[in-house]
Structure formats: C-alpha cells, structure tokens
Amino acid sequence: LELLRASVSAAGHTLAAQRVEEGQKSIVVRRLCEESLTKFLTYLNPSKIMDSLMEFDRIVEQELGKSFSNPIRIRIIVHCGCALERAVTRTPLVYEDSKKDIDTQKLAAIQKAVKVFEDALKLHFSEDELYFMAKMI
C-alpha cells in the first residue's frame, strides 16, 4: 500500500511538473506570437486578440487529440492573427491548391475552432483561409 501511495504521489508530481512546463511553453508561444503580430498587424491590437488566438490553438489541438510543437503553434497562431486582419480588411487569401487533398479531420477541427473568432470578434474567415490553416497543421 505504501509503495502504491508513493507511486501515485510521484505520478502526481510528474503530472504537475508537466503542466507547469506546458504552461511555461504556452507563455513563451503567446509572447512570441504577440511580438510577431505587433510587427504585422495594422488594424488589430495583438494584445486584445491573443486570448482568442490561444483558445483557437487549444481547441484545434483538443479536436485532433494531439499537441503541436511550438514552431507549428506559432506559425498557425500568427497566420490566424493575420487572417483576422484580412477578414477586417476583406482581403482574404485565395487557396489555389486542390481542396480535395486537405485532411477533412483537420479541416473540421479548424472549422470548430474558428467559432471562437465568430463569437468573440464577430469576424468570419473565408473558406480558403480555413484550407490554408488545415494544410499548415
């Protein structure tokens, strides 16, 4: 019984340490994305959209059942922030590759996650923007 308690306690500490490490990685990702978006965006304030962007990332990872590497997270979050600006300026990207080659599970995860922006910011992405995001992940 003592061995079981010690094992459970050690597992709990390991899990807690992993959560702290993940939290620190999220802070780093958030800061890097916010700094990048400050350079790229003209109309949107990155500090005001970061919560929505981080929630978008969380939902996509949850829907796909995987954790993205930090470089992929940064790329998708920055792309998404720029896509929000394109939604504001009504200058969406045009996806010219074959849409039937896109992973439908990834596209469905993106479609669910963008509801964050529709609800919080009343901004909608073009279908082509969604295809670009699905291709990125």
For every predicted segment, state its role.
Residues 1-137:
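A cross-family "folded-core" feature that marks the main globular domain of proteins
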